[in-house]
Amino acid sequence: MLLIPAIDLKDGHCVRLRQGDMDQSTTFGENPAAMARQWIDAGARRLHLVDLNGALAGMPKNYGAIKSILKEVGDDIPVQLGGGIRDLDTIEKYIDGGLRYVIIGTAAVKNPGFLKDACSAFGGHIIVGLDARDGKVATDGWSKLTGHGVVDLARKFEDWGVESIIYTDIGRDGMLSGINIDATVALAQALSIPVIASGGLSGMADIEQLCAVQDEGIEGVICGRAIYSGDLDFAAAQARADEMG
């Protein structure tokens, strides 16, 4: 089970949001590259970056910070990034810059042709982020709720060749209220590609519950507020996950 530290970028700083609200952000670091190194030193095997400004603007807005992280990480571990990725040129720029995976969210839902083209041009590098509330997909930095069901969309995207799905329960994100295990397992069981859990990780109990069901197709979990607030010791959690197989 991959425990993947999240580095959310707003105005060049590392922050955490509550339920995706840009007005409810807490700054955890002024130096994104140093934050990346901190998690690598703690045993991270992948990093999850989010360009929060970019997600709302529809274009990269924290490229300087992202570039500094990629330079710091080098070939140590893979890095994945979401937020503001709406065209093939942006994907190419990021992958050429050292990014392993790009995460397409809103654009996958609103512009499926773009996702198809991205999977065709950059096979193995495309992850789709599906953010949902009550089983329905949300877009535009979580500000708009669609009528699309998570499982139906994920199955379609799987057919197009996406590498994996990141499933975020918006109602729990940044709330330390526990991962929505049942919904994550249900999605993983409906797919043959891996699912990465996200939203609400609160502590070691969540890690143990996810590890217990990882054979259903759950590859990892995004670790956000819990590892910044001290509710979860990242190194200890990764060690526990390894111990559980």
Curated annotation (Swiss-Prot):
GO molecular function list: 1-(5-phosphoribosyl)-5-[(5-phosphoribosylamino)methylideneamino]imidazole-4-carboxamide isomerase activity
Subcellular location: Cytoplasm
A GO CC term assigned to this protein in UniProt: cytoplasm
Pfam families recorded: His_biosynth
EC number from the UniProt entry: 5.3.1.16
Species whose genome carries this gene: Verminephrobacter eiseniae (strain EF01-2)
Protein name: 1-(5-phosphoribosyl)-5-[(5-phosphoribosylamino)methylideneamino] imidazole-4-carboxamide isomerase
InterPro entries: Aldolase_TIM, His_biosynth, HisA_bact_arch, Isoase_HisA-like, Isoase_HisA-like_bact, RibuloseP-bd_barrel
Broad enzyme group: isomerase
GO terms classed as biological process: L-histidine biosynthetic process; L-tryptophan biosynthetic process
Coiled-coil annotated spans: none
Keyword Isomerase in record: yes
Major place of residence: cytoplasm
Associated pathway: Amino-acid biosynthesis; L-histidine biosynthesis; L-histidine from 5-phospho-alpha-D-ribose 1-diphosphate: step 4/9
Domain of life: Bacteria
Catalytic activity: 1-(5-phospho-beta-D-ribosyl)-5-[(5-phospho-beta-D-ribosylamino)methylideneamino]imidazole-4-carboxamide = 5-[(5-phospho-1-deoxy-D-ribulos-1-ylimino)methylamino]-1-(5-phospho-beta-D-ribosyl)imidazole-4-carboxamide
Family named by the database record: Belongs to the HisA/HisF family.
UniProt keyword annotations, A-Z: Amino-acid biosynthesis, Cytoplasm, Histidine biosynthesis, Isomerase
Signal peptide residue numbers: none
Active-site residues, record numbering mapped to chain: 8, 131
